[in-house]
């Protein structure tokens, strides 16, 4: 049983990344199931912290991207909007 309010496709989710931070950081949505969404983000020089590993802020952006998109897919977006904090 799907948790999504409507039937969404992975192609639709991918189209949501245009011209925003997700695109800038290279976040790619790779899989969409009935109750989950999967994305990946490359670790680049500009997303590493001083010790060479992924910066925590970049990790938060990835989590925010997944959470916000999934939240909006669970509601009637004509009546409500879900945003992150």
For every predicted segment, state its role:
Residues 1-85:
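Terminal targeting signals and extreme-terminal segments of soluble enzymes
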């Amino acid at each position: 049983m799907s948790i999504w309010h409507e039937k969404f496709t992975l192609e639709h989710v991918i189209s949501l990344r245009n011209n925003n931070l997700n695109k800038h950081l290279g976040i790619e949505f790779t899989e969409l199931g009935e109750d989950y969404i999967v994305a990946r983000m490359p670790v680049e020089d500009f997303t590493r912290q001083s010790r060479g590993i992924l910066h925590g802020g970049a990790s938060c952006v990835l989590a925010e991207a997944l959470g916000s998109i999934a939240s909006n897919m669970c509601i009637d977006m004509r009546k409500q909007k879900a945003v992150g904090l």
